[in-house]
Amino acid sequence: MIDIPIIRASEVYLTRAEANYNLKNYDDALSDLNLVKERRYSDYEEGSESGAALEKEIQLQRRLELAFEGHRFFDLKRRHEDVQRDGKGFMADGSGVPSSTQHVSADSPYYVMPIPQSEIDANKNMVQNKY
C-alpha cells in the first residue's frame, strides 16, 4: 500500500484545463478551472476568464495548487518558457557572488538534464545529452 499522493484530483483537472485550452476547447478549460477553484476557495464565484486571461489563470492556479511539489520546472519546460530567478540561487560568475538575476533560456543546453549513466550502460546506442 502506498500512503503518499501520486497525483491529486486538482492536478488532473488543471492538466486537463491546460490541454483543453491548447485544443481551443475554452468552455471545457474554464469548467475544469472552476472545479479546482470552487474546491479551494470557500467564497469562490464562478469565473468567466477567456483568451489570454484564461491561460494565465490556469497557469497561476497550477503554480499555486502544486507549489513545492516539483512541477514548476517541468511546466516551464513543457510550455517552452525561460527560467528567470533572482540572485539567491546557486549560479554565480565564478567570483562566489551570485548574479543579480539568473536566466536560462528555453533553448539553453542547461535546460536539459543528463541521462543517468546506468541508462546509457543499458543501451549502448544512447548518447548523453549535451549540458
Mark where each language-model region is:
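Acidic/polar-rich alpha-helix caps and helix-coil junctions
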Residues: 1-131
